[in-house]
């Protein structure tokens, strides 16, 4: 079934636009199965309405969650079905992303996951640009949300995410992922793109979030979590254990990865840190000739742009 959830306007000034949205929904024809339109009787806000839709996974077994400013590929359903088959029973995963962002959301630098033998990578952050959940994945999040305090998991999350306003749920999801050590699986080629229309978070249109859509692929290589090299933490940094699979330059050391130089001191608790920050006494150094940055460590590029200290 297709479920369209329309929030109740919180102020009278939005009532006319809200009525137009409801009329558009009622006029929509869905030939693929049942269509249900839910007009919320009281304002839930963006977060409440999104979580209402996510909870549909517990009713139907799984849900594809799309906000209204997304354009989807014709292949999104094939990817969602294949990803659910591959990952639906893995308790280490909190959800499946339909979107593949082009940038690091904390530093706004380009983000390029290292290639491996799969069409996916893993990241300890969520996305607002299209997700898929199983009933078990949403139930786990719901149970955590009911028990968690406002600071649960916060020590392991970037300050930018902790400072997000109440009408943004990415910070809450980041705390959940950090606290429970769960990940989202992401496609390397995006099945959604954000049109960047004005709304709750943007006063005018933006193309910043747009990415190319994969419109042709029919079969996706859903590499299991344990076999993947491209596994990233909540700071877009490659997990040390995965980096050690690609090079022996750091193997045997207890180190944190901070190549984007965005981790606060509270996250740098390992014996060593691999970083692009200036260091006075580095045990090893690497250049910065290659992209992504970890490629310099893998190739042993000489230089002093990256430090193990």
Language-model features: locations:
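Peripheral/terminal regions associated with large enzymatic or DNA-binding modules
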Residues: 1-66, 70-309
